[in-house]
């Protein structure tokens, strides 16, 4: 039995939700990609492009953004790590979308541009109803909220 988990917010899940942090999504482009000198990447520019789709549930956050804007890239589903996605983009095999937290501290030869309009994934804690949680789980959630607030 699982009491709680850290996740990105999913609308279809009927669990209690504790928001912790917004994590901005970025366009990941090859180093030689010509974005016309713009400092942002219009979401609609993904339309019709070879798009390397990250795996392990992150695709849900990305599909939400693409669907909201009616964008249909040529999705290539992958079962590889974020590092491999970045390397594939670096070598011109497509474009992708990843989050700031995934890219934090990396020194890759790709362009990482904010999306226009801005898009984020809301990170937090999904749990069974709070009234059903054991006291130590409620305390853990409170500590996590406090710790993230201080960051």
Where on the chain are the PLM-derived regions?
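Short secondary-structure boundary/capping segments
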Residues: 16-19, 35, 42-44, 65-67, ...
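Short helix-loop capping/hinge motifs at secondary-structure junctions, enriched
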Residues: 12-13, 32-42, 117-119, 130-136
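A late-sequence structural motif
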Residues: 113-151
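Short beta-strand-centered segments that line the small-molecule binding cleft or hinge
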Residues: 1-25, 29, 37, 89-93, ...
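Alpha-helical segments flanking ligand/cofactor-binding loops in enzyme cores
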Residues: 18, 44, 86-87, 138
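Secondary-structure junction motif
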Residues: 35, 49-70, 133-141, 151
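Hydrophobic hinge/microswitch elements
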Residues: 1, 8, 57-111
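Small-molecule pocket liners
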Residues: 15-17, 22-27, 31-33, 43, ...
